[in-house]
């Protein structure tokens, strides 16, 4: 088990807190292992901490998934207040961990610092509260160098790292040291990564701005949808009127545009209000993206009109 605790497979019930909308692959992991997922609604500042603080009183709750910076899919960054409360949690389970997936820590869309989000440093905050073992922070170069072929890293207390290394020794004989060296020689240091990410931003920024411009032009002020305006990350989160997301998805698909499957951003793929759609602008060309965004806006209008007529 976690640092000598009872292995989860020997417990009757294991639960995880899942801020949602959130990362579908996190939810896929917990679902695969039969771990009960508890949906924690997201606010503009991060997870609803009143609920988090209440749920961790249950010793069966063993962890919480967090993408704290430019969250997938909302694109928001946890506020200092949320981070402070997270770092001061009092979980009943000694093996409770905050799984702090800082995947988008350098993924800014703008070079100017005032147009970038900033995230408090959580390991030192937890340590200051005497809770340094409560957090496992990890990230990778998946969206920096090579998707699925970069390098990953973990930051944690010495106790946690000793425990992790003990498991990793069994899992793998040796990591790809040539790939590690390749990354070190290419990036050299943190400044090298920041400079490289400016090149990513130069590609991503106009795509985000294009989609946001189309949404504002076509849907602004109509009251049939809301959307985030991220300063970084890879996604724009769009909320339709209640009960319309699946219809929008299907209309787009029928017209030749494939969106992220509706519901994917929630545990068990169940969006309780059928509203959330994750928009990923990175892949299409600018010309294709403009067509896709305009078609998406049209499908939102059609689905909304149908819903309003249905409710008359």
Predicted regions, residues:
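Conserved core of the PLP fold type I
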Residues: 1-94, 105-130, 245, 297, ...
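Conserved core segment of the aminotransferase class I/II
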Residues: 32, 124-205, 217-218
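Hydrophobic "anchor" residues on beta-strands that sit immediately upstream
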Residues: 63, 97, 136
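Walker B catalytic acidic pair
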Residues: 101-102
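PLP-dependent enzyme catalytic core of the Aspartate aminotransferase-like
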Residues: 131, 254, 269-312
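Conserved glycine-rich beta-strand-loop-beta hairpin in the small C-terminal domain of fold type I
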Residues: 198-212, 224-239, 253
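Helix N-cap motif at beta-to-alpha junctions
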Residues: 241-245, 284-286
């Amino acid at each position: 088990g976690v640092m000598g605790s009872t292995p989860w497979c020997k417990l009757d019930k294991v639960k995880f807190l899942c801020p949602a909308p959130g990362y579908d692959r996190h939810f896929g992991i917990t679902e695969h292992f039969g771990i009960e997922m508890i949906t924690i609604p997201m606010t503009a500042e991060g997870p609803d901490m009143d609920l988090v603080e209440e749920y961790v009183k249950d010793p069966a709750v063993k962890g919480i998934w967090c993408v704290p910076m430019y969250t997938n899919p909302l694109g928001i960054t946890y506020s200092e207040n949320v981070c402070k409360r997270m770092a001061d949690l009092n979980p009943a389970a000694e093996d409770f961990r905050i799984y702090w997936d800082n995947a988008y820590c350098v993924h800014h869309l703008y070079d100017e610092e005032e147009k970038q989000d900033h995230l408090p440093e959580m390991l030192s905050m937890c340590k200051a509260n005497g809770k340094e073992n409560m957090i496992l922070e990890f990230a990778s170069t998946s969206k920096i160098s090579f998707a699925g072929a970069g390098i990953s890293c973990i930051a944690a207390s010495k106790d946690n790292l000793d425990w992790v290394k003990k498991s990793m020794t069994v899992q793998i004989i040796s990591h790809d040291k040539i790939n590690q060296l390749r990354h070190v020689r290419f990036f050299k240091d943190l400044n090298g990564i920041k400079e490289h990410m400016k090149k990513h931003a130069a590609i991503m920024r106009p795509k985000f701005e294009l989609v946001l411009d189309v949404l504002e032009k076509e849907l602004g002020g109509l009251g049939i949808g809301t959307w985030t305006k991220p300063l970084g990350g890879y996604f724009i989160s769009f909320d339709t009127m209640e009960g319309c997301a699946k219809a929008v998805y299907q209309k787009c698909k029928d017209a030749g545009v494939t969106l992220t499957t509706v519901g994917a951003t929630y545990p068990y793929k169940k969006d309780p209000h059928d509203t959330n759609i994750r928009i990923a602008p990175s892949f299409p060309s600018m010309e294709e993206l403009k067509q896709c965004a305009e078609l998406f806006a049209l499908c939102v209008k059609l689905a909304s009109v149908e819903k309003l007529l249905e409710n008359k």
